[in-house]
Amino acid sequence: MIVVLRIGHRPQRDMRVTTHVGLTARALGADGMYIAADDRGVVTSIRDVADRFGGEFFVEDKVGWNSCIKRWKQDGGVVVHLTMFGLNLPDVEEEIRTKEKILVIVGAEKVPGDLYQMADYNVAVTNQPHSEIAGLAVFLDHIAPNALHREFPGAKVRVFPNPCGKTVEEL
């Protein structure tokens, strides 16, 4: 099980990016997303996509990040904080891949310093500044089994690969 925890979300500024964090998580193998802020718009957008395109994916806002992390660890899960200051992904991915319950923290603004100590792994997708969406996508591609070949049961819409154009089927 892989779940994303989005912290530092600022509703007026980060709605689009946080929505894309959730959509990326869903498409690339995560089971759900917690948002440590109150933003029904983001929740509604992600749930709408999950409803139309299928698959099981939950999204929940108004989650206290500190208590979420503590609860996750008490339940036997590991916490991975994506940060450019962490250990390089290729150096830890094999070990992380063996874990059954992974909470992936994706920050928006500067994260609290104690988060680095709370995480079991501080992981960098390069030690260079870039998008948190890109970092999550690369991380999930390396960690989630067969993420690029997933099926999404219960879809109302299906997109088919097409070398030149669009093929979309309403189910």
Swiss-Prot record:
Leading EC class: transferase
InterPro entries, alphabetized: Alpha/beta_knot_MTases, tRNA_m1G_MTases_N, tRNA_mtfrase_aTrm56
Subcellular location: Cytoplasm
A single GO cellular-component term on record: cytoplasm
A biological process from GO: tRNA nucleoside ribose methylation
Chief location of this protein within or outside the cell: cytoplasm
Keyword field contains Transferase: yes
Catalysed reaction equations from the record: cytidine(56) in tRNA + S-adenosyl-L-methionine = 2'-O-methylcytidine(56) in tRNA + S-adenosyl-L-homocysteine + H(+)
An example molecular function term from Gene Ontology annotations: tRNA (cytidine(56)-2'-O)-methyltransferase activity
Sites where the protein binds S-adenosyl-L-methionine: 82, 107-111
EC number(s) per entry: 2.1.1.206
Keyword annotations: Cytoplasm, Methyltransferase, S-adenosyl-L-methionine, Transferase, tRNA processing
Subunit structure: Homodimer.
UniProt cross-references to NCBIfam families, sorted A to Z: PRK03958.1
Name of protein: tRNA (cytidine(56)-2'-O)-methyltransferase
Natural source organism: Methanospirillum hungatei JF-1 (strain ATCC 27890 / DSM 864 / NBRC 100397 / JF-1)
